[in-house]
Regions:
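Cysteine-rich micro-motifs
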Residues: 177-188
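Short metal-binding segments enriched for Cys and/or His
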Residues: 191-202
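Short alpha-helical segments used as structural interaction elements across diverse proteins
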Residues: 78, 82, 186-191
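Short helix-coil boundary/hinge micro-motifs
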Residues: 1-163, 167, 172, 202-205
Length: 205
């Protein structure tokens, strides 16, 4: 099944917030944060449409800029996002990892061939290269993101994973020192909420 169309890419929209700390290092963390809750009950999904999903993949070096993404495959990317979020949430909350999320991430890691095979041609001679036909662009992207999530969740940075401490934000980040906000905006909102609670006597801390 082809995931790519021949349609031209649409205009890239700017995200509502800068990447959370750690998201530039771990694309899987940025994927987990690609759907976010905004003040006033609003939400933003950076993978809402096939064009949005294609732009996100292109921006992370996981798809060519001149390829479009079909909805069925954009849905697969959104599904992997939810499974990675479930694993991050279980890690942050200290709960057992959901079996369905483990299975989905493991399947994504093994769906595309990861080995760089040997090839020979007159120009380059003997060399290694990974198969990456157009029909497998999404599979390779999902495999890369799943492997990145596994590294994040089991590596040295796993202890620094935390949820943004400024409701209604639902993003995750890698904690630096005592900071537990994903952005300056969330930090300002949390400080303003604490100041308001102190003024009105509603501080439960």
């Amino acid at each position: 099944m082809r995931c790519m169309t021949d349609s031209a890419p649409a205009e890239i929209l700017e995200p509502a917030a800068p990447p959370a700390p750690g998201a530039e290092q771990y694309p899987a963390l940025d994927l987990a944060n690609s759907a976010m809750a905004l003040p006033g009950g609003h939400t933003l999904d950076l993978l809402a449409t096939p064009a949005d999903a294609g732009h996100w993949l292109t921006g992370h070096g996981l798809a060519p800029a001149d390829a479009g993404l079909r909805e069925v495959c954009a849905a697969q990317l959104r599904s992997l996002r939810e499974q990675i979020r479930a694993l991050i949430a279980s890690r942050v909350d200290g709960h057992p990892a959901p079996a369905s999320a483990l299975a989905a991430v493991n399947e994504a890691m093994t769906k595309a061939p990861a080995a760089a095979l040997l090839h020979w041609d007159a120009t380059r001679g003997l060399h290694r290269a990974s198969a990456h036909p157009t029909t497998q662009i999404l599979e390779h992207a999902l495999a890369a993101l799943a492997a990145d999530a596994a590294e994040l969740l089991t590596g040295a940075d796993a202890e620094r994973l935390t949820a943004c401490g400024s409701p209604p934000c639902t993003r995750y980040l890698l904690r630096h020192g005592r900071r537990q906000w994903c952005s300056v905006r969330c930090g300002d909102r949390a400080r303003a909420a604490r100041a308001y609670a102190r003024r009105t006597g509603r501080d439960d801390a």
